């Protein structure tokens, strides 16, 4: 899980979602997981 100021999709399978007021990227590839911090 990377914590970044700007989260972006890194492939077609990445999905941007909002959890607990935070924007996150979830993907099949675990390396693409990101969280806005």
Swiss-Prot record:
Official protein name in the record: Large ribosomal subunit protein bL36
Top-level taxon of origin: Bacteria
Provenance organism: Persephonella marina (strain DSM 14350 / EX-H1)
Keyword tags: Ribonucleoprotein, Ribosomal protein
Family note: Belongs to the bacterial ribosomal protein bL36 family.
HAMAP family: Ribosomal_bL36
Primary gene name: rpmJ
Gene Ontology terms, MF aspect: structural constituent of ribosome
Pfam families per UniProt: Ribosomal_L36
SUPFAM superfamilies: Ribosomal protein L36 (SSF57840)
GO cellular component: cytoplasm; ribonucleoprotein complex; ribosome
Biological processes annotated in GO: translation
